[in-house]
UniProtKB/Swiss-Prot annotation:
One of its GO terms (biological process) is translation. Residues 1-12 form a propeptide. The gene is rpmA. This is Large ribosomal subunit protein bL27. Belongs to the bacterial ribosomal protein bL27 family. One of its GO terms (cellular component) is cytosolic large ribosomal subunit. One of its GO terms (molecular function) is structural constituent of ribosome. The N-terminus is cleaved by ribosomal processing cysteine protease Prp. The keyword Ribosomal protein applies. It comes from Streptococcus equi subsp. zooepidemicus (strain H70).
Amino acid sequence: MVKLNLSNLQHFAHKKGGGSTSNGRDSQAKRLGAKAADGQTVSGGSILYRQRGTHIYPGVNVGRGGDDTLFAKVEGVVRFERKGRDKKQVSVYPIAK
């Protein structure tokens, strides 16, 4: 009869090691989108819409910044409008005094 020596048994892992990954990060949100609502009164220089590219085009009294941000050139009321069949624009109409 063979006698087993239990103190010499090796225990192997039943799960693989965790390893590492190159994922697990995310960039901060850029806070893009509308900053003024339709019908809202804004002052000159106010940011109306932050975007990457031209999702919305500048209309009357609206300028476009270097990063495609749309801003009001004059004080007035914001209007989001259609420009043709498939484009949108934002305009600022001065308040009549």
